[in-house]
């Protein structure tokens, strides 16, 4: 299970939480964490910088344009050397047969080939690659005609009418194409001599509205209605989560964890990757790793502890005193950096000895 903070939207906010370790709860109500003061993104070394300081080159690829979430301002400050959006990816001019677009957006298969092209180019220059890719093929809208009514997997339902099922089939076809593209990517990496780890995750579930305005989740009885006010913590945790996969072209890279299952989250996946790769980390990321052991998700809507147990909030969670002290320490460190006198901010960017 991969716990998220949003349902149906919020990709840029989730990226900021994953790559930098901050959430909306760390700031005042209504604060957009993608549009903070520019220097806020330089208080701590971000996840990519844990790798670039060891000789990696960090690049971001996005299958759409650069208009969303202030990425062109914030991402360079998080350690990315280059940002490649749709037009930049197409300008790479790598060998490709077939169409570039699937439905309304760039095909995942084409996008992954671009990532392979960038990895090979970076490796050939003598560097290792930290690549962060954001695919788009299965993004909303889910209009029935999006994929020309194609659905490679048969699906039926006793709860949904044919018009609603046409929408569901669009999402299912997008998932199928993503799965096939991931298979092509891992097949290519099997043939690569470069030791490579792939982290593949869905940042949030789609809203997937049906013809009458209800979501598919309401129709299938997974929640009482579209308004989360009446949902239980268990319902929120279920629908505010997706799946994730960590794969490597050499099982030894997974440190004996190949084939295992482990709950993770938007804020826990970074520390999890750092642990797997044995990367030298700063005190800030060491703190986030410890926090992830007691807290997978903490938002205004719900809280999930380190075992995957949801609660309505941190106050209601069955946490030990030590766990609460750890959460308070994280809060204090961030407050000092963002609003205080930065008494310990520099020290938090020092490597763990």
How does the language model describe each region?
Residues 1-353:
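Solvent-exposed soluble domains appended to multi-pass membrane proteins
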